[in-house]
Each structure stands twice: as structure tokens, then as C-alpha cells.
């Protein structure tokens, strides 16, 4: 099902009181933030039961399943982003696959509702296909994603400051995808303030693995 059909159901569910208590694994979604390779905010780490839940959610994107992630992410965004900027634009990172991952667009729509920012998916598109990168290291991912996006030019001559742009994706790994998307927008004179995502892949030393992942079969984590 296409994300425009799912987004209204998600937003309607999030606005209703009496949502069920989150599952036990959601207690680990305490919010994360970092500055490299670009400013980023995440609900939690991509590991354990949370990782398995995201994989299931990608195949069956239910509003109730996304809610714990949004609640884990929002405090970081409100403290570090929304309080410092006027309402800006939210751009989900697009997929080049015909059957696109629904989670970035669903998360972007939910964040717009909660933060009062505007959803603008049309600002960014894929300019070419890329290799599946779930077994690629950082340098190969950077090369794989370089030049893979094209952005709409920012309007010239408008009155007042141009709105900032927040990128949205489901998982942040090396940052190759996010950096390539941000570069395309910046080349068209948009100011990208960072990336909001559901989960951050643990660095080497956490769960005994580095920043590669075998979990996103079609696109691979960024």
C-alpha cells in the first residue's frame, strides 16, 4: 500500500487518547543524538528486539507499531531542533525501488503533525539507482550514493529567511545516504539542519559489530 494512503491513518491514530502501553523493548528508545557525519537524531539503537520490530514494521507498517519510535524521537527533536528554528520543511529520503520502504515517508508525516513543520517530499528525488549496500563498508557506501540524488532549486527572491530542511530516514548507519541527500539539497541552496531517523546502527564495540548491517535487503542502511 502506498504511503499517502497509510499516512492519514497514522496521524489519526496518533491524535487519539488511550493508546496502548508500549512493549517492553520500547523502554530502550530513550532518544539519541550526534553530530557526525551530519547532525542526527534517533529514537534508539538498531539492535535486539527493536531491530526485529523495525524489520516487521517495514513489511507491515502499522500506526500502532510506529508510535513508540516517534515518542522516543520527539524529545530529542524538540530540545535540539524545533526550539532553535522556525517551522521548516521535512523531506523523507526517497528510495529508487519501485516498492519503496514506507517508513521514511510515514515518519516524516508523523513528525510534521507533531512539530508543525511542512512535508515536502517533492524537493528530493533519486537521479540513478544504487547498489544494495548492506555488505558495503563506509567508503564504498559513500561512493555508491555519490550523485544519487537530485533536488529542486530553492526559490530565489523570496521575502524573509528560507525555511530549513530536515531529512528523514528509517535507519542511520554510516551516513552515506543522508550525506548524499543533504549535498544535493545544499547544491540547490537549501539549508539542511540534519537527519531524523528511527534507529542508529551501533558502532563497533556495541553488540560486537561495526557500522554495516545485513537487514535492509532492498536499499541497505545508509
List the model feature ranges, each with a label.
Residues 1-222:
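Glycine-rich phosphate/pyrophosphate-handling loop used in enzymes and phosphotransfer proteins
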